[in-house]
Swiss-Prot record:
Involved in phosphonate degradation. Binds 1 Mg(2+) ion per subunit. Keywords: Aminotransferase, Hydrolase, Magnesium, Metal-binding, Multifunctional enzyme, Pyridoxal phosphate, Pyruvate, Schiff base, Transferase. This is Bifunctional phosphonoacetaldehyde hydrolase/aminoethylphosphonate transaminase. It catalyses: (2-aminoethyl)phosphonate + pyruvate = phosphonoacetaldehyde + L-alanine; phosphonoacetaldehyde + H2O = acetaldehyde + phosphate + H(+). InterPro entries: Aminotrans_V_dom, HAD-like_sf, HAD-SF_hydro_IA, HAD_sf, NH2EtPonate_pyrv_transaminase, PGP-like_dom2, Phosphonoacetald_hydro, PyrdxlP-dep_Trfase. One of its GO terms (molecular function) is phosphonoacetaldehyde hydrolase activity. The gene is phnXW. Mg(2+) binds at D15, A17, D189. PANTHER family: 2-AMINOETHYLPHOSPHONATE--PYRUVATE TRANSAMINASE (PTHR42778:SF1). In the N-terminal section; belongs to the HAD-like hydrolase superfamily. PhnX family. Its EC number is 3.11.1.1, 2.6.1.37.
Amino acid sequence: MKKIYGEKIKAVVFDWAGTTVDYGCFAPLNVFIEIFKRRGIDVTMEEARKPMGKLKIDHIREMCEMDRIKNIWSDKFGKVPTEDDVNELYAEFEPMLFETLEEYTTPIPHVVETIEKLRKNGLKIGSTTGYTREMMNIVEPNAAKKGYSPDFLVTPSEVSQGRPYPWMCYKNAEALGVSPMSSMVKVGDTISDVKEGVNAGMWSVAVIKGSSELGLTQEEVENMDKEELKAKMSIVSKKFKEAGAHFVIETMAELEDILIKIENETIKSDFVPENDYILLTPGPLSTTKSVRASMLKDWCTWDVEYNNLVQDVRRRLVSLATQNTDKYTSVLMQGSGTFSVEAIIGSTISKDGKLLVIANGAYGKRMKDICNYLNIQFVDCTFKDIEAVDLNVVENLLKENKDITHISMVHCETTTGRLNPIQEVGKLAKEYNKIYIVDAMSSFGGIEIDVEDFNIDFLVSSSNKCIQGVPGFGFIIANKEELSKCKGIAKSLSLDVYAQWDTMEKNNGKWRFTSPTHVVRAFYQALLELEEEGSVEKRYARYKENQFTIASRLKSLGFDTLVNDNAQSPVITTFLYPKNAKFEFMEFYTYLKDNGFVIYPGKLTDIDTFRIGSIGEVYPTDMERLADVIEKFINR
């Protein structure tokens, strides 16, 4: 039999109730309603279904936190539900569910035959659930008798956290022997299912008929007026897409077509040409083939699918930036990173404001240029390019210039590769009640930053740096309260951050002017790949190892580094020309390029240097190969 999929996609992980068995996911529903009813609280079907897919005790806990239920509980018992109440409810829930669970193990239509086809194409079948292992000890064998049995099952009680966390999916990948996560598909029927798959870096497919989200019996679906059913399904589909589902299907019979589509999307990357060289620069940088392949499709800026993707990107950026996601928002701005730096300075500092510009490199100094162009008052706090920021000097300027309203500085100054003390300056900003702007262009996504912990009001970065997208837009992580005060301040039509934010909020991700659609789609793919790598912590570790590898190898060849190790970033390293050797940079550059590597010239005017970046789709083995090429150049 010729495979029509299964070359790129290796496994499908299914949910249980509402996806593969128990049409409509009714087994736990009535029990959730009953345990509250026993306490004189009538919960609605919608309330009982909303947390579906989660570990059942977490489901009960979330119901207890719903405003209406919590208020009724408080009126009846004189207090809001406590953790003891949650445990008591669960203690009743579990035995009641056990009594009826066996009745809800019949496979949903099209499941058994679809999975048989998947296996014939060589796919492995995994599963996750919101049930405990004890519950699944009833469901799993009974479903097997009726024709459905996956290759692997993991329950929330066997990992540190259930949905929407990705840990159960990771367990499936390990048990099934499948990697990367992008070669796996998650299929489910709840919002938490969708998020589980997305958070795991998998393709996420949501099914409507039989789902908990639709909440109808098979008989109701078959007998309902077609237009009424269509309207209900449309609402469910929208919820799934807003949660991040890549595809939404009506029934499991459509899954094969989706797998073929995913396979073809993945195969596109096979037709993306290899790069002629590795970019060892601080951005633009080397990207994955899958990021480049994601730009092969055209997108309409008005289309809801594209705008939903924009909203998803915005949410993911805020989640990368802070744990307090309610306090911050993100705004995407067309253009290079400097466009966004100019936009935030011009959109937040009024004619009566004054900016303290802390600079020890070209990109800090560029902020002064922006102020001069925009006629913004500023206090100059410039250090030499090879100097560290002196916090005493910064604080003295704050004391001497009480009319300063804002502070700005660069986190990773790629002029030298130095990391600046943004957290310490953030403490000063808070102490002196100043608005704090950080240019984290070459660090965000590659070095852990929590904007709330660092007291950052506005953080600026761009698509083509540590998140490993391509050039085309910048973005601002903004304190909502401070951004809301900025209406009418902007000194530019197209660089008005407040207006861009307002439009994106009111129009579900729409940009004010034409957006770089292909770049946004590539950035979304890059975000998924960052999550798949293990988020910022793991990417930082890789970048750090890259930097250490090339720095240590080149030091052994006579190339000293400019910045001390304690201030050296993992982003880019500035090397001094070797002593006692004839060294001509363009000859060196050309030799490296001919051998598959592109580096940066130095940016200092009074010291002979060159720079090597360590970010992007680059690994320590690449740095070892680069060092070997440099050694051959030196020893010619």
